[in-house]
Amino acid sequence: MAGFWSKLFSSEEKPSSAQTAKDRLKVIVASEQGLGRRLSQDKIDQMKKEIMQVVSRYVSGVGEQHIQMQVRSEANIEMLEMNINLPEER
């Protein structure tokens, strides 16, 4: 996991800013067990609103329809996966 963060924030040759933004905005929070039981749909919706408010400070045109969040299981790990589709610049 440390390799992931060091790649995002290292001072070596950097990928395009669009790719960096995409990588930073795709967030996966993993838990060994019980994430789905701890996060109700109301909590996910509230988290979505708060994330939208933060992102909209830096990127114009981002709304709730641009943020997708889901809880899924993979290899006995439950994950909260979030994707933010940035609108085209006008």
Curated annotation (Swiss-Prot):
Keywords annotated in UniProt: Cell cycle, Cell division
Pfam families: MinE
UniProt function note: Prevents the cell division inhibition by proteins MinC and MinD at internal division sites while permitting inhibition at polar sites. This ensures cell division at the proper site by restricting the formation of a division septum at the midpoint of the long axis of the cell.
Region (Disordered): 1-21
UniProt keyword annotation of Manganese present: no
Protein name: Cell division topological specificity factor
Origin superkingdom: Bacteria
Basic and acidic residues composition-biased segments: 10-21
Family label: Belongs to the MinE family.
Species of provenance: Acinetobacter baumannii (strain ATCC 17978 / DSM 105126 / CIP 53.77 / LMG 1025 / NCDC KC755 / 5377)
The keyword Protease is annotated on this UniProt entry: no
Record gene name: minE
GO terms (BP aspect): cell division; regulation of division septum assembly
